[in-house]
Amino acid sequence: MSAIPGFGGDLNSNIDEDSNLNKSSVVEINGQSEWRFEVPFRTIMKLKVVNGIGEIFGTELPLNVEISLTGVKYAIYAPLDEGCKVEYYCVSNKANSTSTNEDDEISEYISEETSMNHYMNLHFALESYRQSISEHNFVNSSSQKTGPRVLVVGNRHSGKTSLVKTLASYGCKMDRSPILVNLNPRDGVFSVPGSLTATPISDAFDLESVNGWGGSTTSGSTFHNPKQPLVKNYGFTSHSDNLDLYKYQISKLGVAVVSRMEEDIAVKNSGLLIDTPPLSIKDFTIIENIVSDFEVNIIVVIGNERLLIDLKKKFKHKIASSQLDFVKVPKSGGVIEVDDAYIRKSQEESIKEYFNGTIRSPLSPFKTELDAKDFVIYKCVDSSEANSNLSFLPSGDSFTPEASEMSDGDKKEEFSLDTYYSQLQEPSSSNLDNSIVAITQLPQNNKSARDLMNTCVLGYAHVSKFDDTKSKMKVLLPFPGALPRNILISTSVGYTE
C-alpha cells in the first residue's frame, strides 16, 4: 500500500532520518499577533497547531494535523484573542541538500505589529459589497450586477500576492467563489512560470505545495479540491520582455473572465481579485488596460502614497463618474525582500511540482520521444532582442515586409504575428533543449495567425533533449498519454531535471 502513489508512500522520502532526533519547539502566539518564519529549501519544517486558531494568508490550519513546509516565507496569524499554540520541528530535506547554497537554519520571530486588521477590514467591505450584489441579483434577474472587481498594485516586495491570497481565502470562508487572476508571469499560479491564469477559488489553498497555491487539473489529480485555471501562455517571466504580447494576452484573458462571470451567478456575485507584477506610474498604460479589460471598479494600492495620488489623477474621470474607487492599505512588516536566486529556485520547484506532483499527491510523469517534423512549433519573440536588431538600421529607416511576401488580405494579420511569435523552421538543440513548451488547443492544420494568438493552453511539456541528427525530441509530460498534434509554443522558461 505504501508504494501506491497518493497513499503516503513518498511522504517522508526526502527526510533525513538522522534529523528526526531534533526536539520539537513550542510557539505561543498572542491574539492579533503573528509568528513569522523563513524555511530554506534545504530544510523541512513540520508543524501543527495544538491549541487555538492559526491561519496562513487567510487559510486556517487544521488542529492537531501536521503539515510540512520547505522553501517558504510564511506567517501564522492568530485572529482570536485566545491566540494559538504551535509545535514544530525541523529536518533536513535530502532532495535539496546540495542544490542551494543557503543555510539550513530557519529564522523566526513573533510580531505584535501586523497589517492583518487592515486586510480583514478590506475583506469585510468587499463581503458587504458582495452581499448587496447578491441580494440585488436575486430579485432582479433581468438586470444583474457584478461583484467587486479588485486590482491590487504596488511596488516590488510590497505583499501584493499575500494580500490577494488572503482576500481569496476569506472569500471562500464566506462561501464565495472569486476568480483569482494572476498577471505576474514570474509566478506559476496553478500552472508553470511564464503563464497568465484565471482561476475560480472555491476551496482552501494547499499550503504544502510550492508557493502555497495547490495543484490543478492541468497536471493530474490533486490532494485538495482541484482548481481549474484558464491558462494563457506568455512565455517569459518578466512582463517587460514583450509588452505587446503581454497586453494582448491580458486583453484576451479579460474577455474570457468577463464571459465566465456572465455565465456563473456564484462567480458573478463574488467578483475578481487581480494580482499584478511590480507596477509604477510609468506602467500606467498596463494598469489602464487591466482596468478596462477586466472592468475593474476597485484599485487597492499597497503602501505607496505617491502611486495612489498619481493613479487618482489619471483616473479622475472614472472617479467622478463613480466607476472606480481607490483603497490604500499599509505594507505588512512581514514582507521579505527575496533575491533572484530564491525566485529562480522557487520557479524550478514550481515546474518540478507541475510534472511530479507533491509529496501527498505524487504524479507519474511520462517520458516519450517525438519526431519534431510531426509538429508545428512557434517561439515567443523577445522584444528586447528585436529592438536590438532594429537598432542597426540607419537613422530614420524601419523594417517593412516585401509586398510579394503575403496576400493583401493577410498582410496586416501575418505581419502582426511577427511581433508576438516566430515559427521555428529548423528546431534544434540550441532552441529547444531544457525548455518548457506550451501545448495549445489549436490543431496544427489551422494556419490562422489570429487563432494562434487567441488560443489557450491545454498543458505544458518539458523538452529535456533534442537530437539534431535524428530530429527527435525527448519530452516529459505530467501524465501518460499521447501528445496531441496541436501547435506547440516554446517558451523562454528553462528547466533541467
Swiss-Prot record:
Where is the protein situated, by its record's location annotation? Nucleus
Q: Which UniProt keywords apply?
A: ATP-binding, mRNA processing, Nucleotide-binding, Nucleus
Q: What Gene3D superfamilies has UniProt attached to this entry? A: Clp1, DNA binding domain, P-loop containing nucleotide triphosphate hydrolases, Pre-mRNA cleavage complex subunit Clp1, C-terminal domain
Q: Where are the transmembrane segments?
A: none
The processes (GO biological process) annotated in the record are:
mRNA 3'-end processing; tRNA splicing, via endonucleolytic cleavage and ligation
* Keyword Cytoplasm applies: no
Which Pfam families does its entry note?
Clp1 (PF06807), CLP1_N (PF16573), CLP1_P (PF16575)
According to the UniProt record, which cysteines are disulfide-bonded? none
Residues holding ATP: E34, K73, H157, S158, G159, K160, T161, S162
Which positions carry the signal peptide feature in this UniProt record?
A: none
One GO cellular component from the entry?
A: mRNA cleavage factor complex
Quote one Gene Ontology molecular function term. Answer: ATP binding
Nucleotide-binding found in the keyword field = yes
Among PANTHER family, the record links this protein to:
CLEAVAGE/POLYADENYLATION FACTOR IA SUBUNIT CLP1P, POLYRIBONUCLEOTIDE 5'-HYDROXYL-KINASE CLP1
Give the protein's biological function.
Required for endonucleolytic cleavage during polyadenylation-dependent pre-mRNA 3'-end formation.
Q: How does it assemble?
A: Component of a pre-mRNA cleavage factor complex. Interacts directly with PCF11.
**Similarity annotation:** Belongs to the Clp1 family. Clp1 subfamily.
| Cited HAMAP family | Clp1 (MF_03035)
The name under which this protein is listed is: mRNA cleavage and polyadenylation factor CLP1
